[in-house]
């Protein structure tokens, strides 16, 4: 059975609360504020844990993007009052890197018109646009992703990306070889692109060893 990476969106009204069972999981705060156990998070902040956690929204409510990794269907949980969950994307990871693994959660920002030259990554992942619009070209197909749109990249397939006419940013989770802790996973396809100035900027939220025992 292949591990499954899921991205869901949780909407919590004021004082809405939900308890999640133990799984490798990253929460990204889109709007509002919430308590993750005893820690308070606001917009653009992240919580990662493999342990069970209870999330409680502040009076402003909260919109949260949540990445989970599980072996098949995750353990069931029940949303409390004032909580609505919508699954955005779910993908079996059929070609995970061999050996020890790494969970990386980060964001990638582009100036208007900025590009990511044709490249690969060393593991699979799910992305979601939080600001602007990004065109992604891969395997002969081109798609434009606006705010809230998510997509999957397997890793080995070459990808070219270009931002629209506004600043653009997406958040992603990738499952990578553990040897890449603290290192970039990007591999440029064309030699001439390696030395070119790069317009994208990275912000790493989570870069930690991953075990599938709890999944």
Model-derived segments and their meaning:
Residues 1-24:
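Short Lys/Arg-enriched alpha/beta "domain-start" segment
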Residues 9-14, 26, 33-55, 110, ...:
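Short acidic-glycine-tyrosine-enriched beta hairpin
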Residues 17-21, 38, 116-121, 161-164:
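Short histidine-centered beta-strand/loop micro-motifs
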Residues 22-35, 110, 121-136, 173-177:
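Short, conserved beta-strand element in jelly-roll/cupin
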Residues 40, 50-81, 155-183:
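Ligand-binding loop in jelly-roll beta-barrel domains
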Residues 65-115:
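Surface-exposed beta-loop interaction hotspot
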Residues 98-148:
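A contiguous binding-surface segment within folded domains or other stable secondary-structure elements
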Residues 184-215:
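Acidic/histidine-enriched, glycine/proline-rich intrinsically disordered or flexible terminal extensions
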């Amino acid at each position: 059975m292949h591990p499954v990476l899921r991205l869901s969106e949780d909407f919590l009204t004021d004082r809405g609360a939900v308890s999640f069972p133990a799984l490798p999981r990253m929460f990204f705060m889109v709007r509002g504020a919430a308590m993750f156990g005893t820690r308070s998070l606001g917009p653009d902040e992240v919580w990662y844990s493999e342990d069970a956690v209870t999330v409680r929204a502040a009076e402003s409510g909260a919109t949260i993007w949540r990445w989970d990794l599980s072996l098949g269907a995750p353990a069931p949980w029940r949303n409390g009052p004032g909580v609505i969950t919508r699954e955005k994307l779910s993908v079996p990871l059929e070609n995970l890197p061999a050996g020890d693994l790494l969970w990386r959660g980060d964001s990638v920002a582009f100036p208007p018109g900025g590009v990511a030259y044709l490249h690969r990554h060393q593991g699979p992942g799910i992305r979601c646009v939080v600001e602007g619009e990004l065109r992604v070209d891969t395997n002969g197909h081109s798609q434009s992703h606006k705010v809230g749109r998510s997509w999957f990249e397997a890793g080995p397939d070459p990808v070219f990306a270009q931002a629209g006419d506004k600043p653009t940013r997406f958040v992603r989770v990738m499952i990578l070889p553990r040897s890449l802790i603290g290192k970039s996973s990007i591999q440029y396809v064309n030699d001439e692109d390696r030395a070119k100035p790069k317009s994208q900027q990275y912000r790493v939220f989570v870069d930690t060893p991953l075990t599938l025992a709890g999944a």
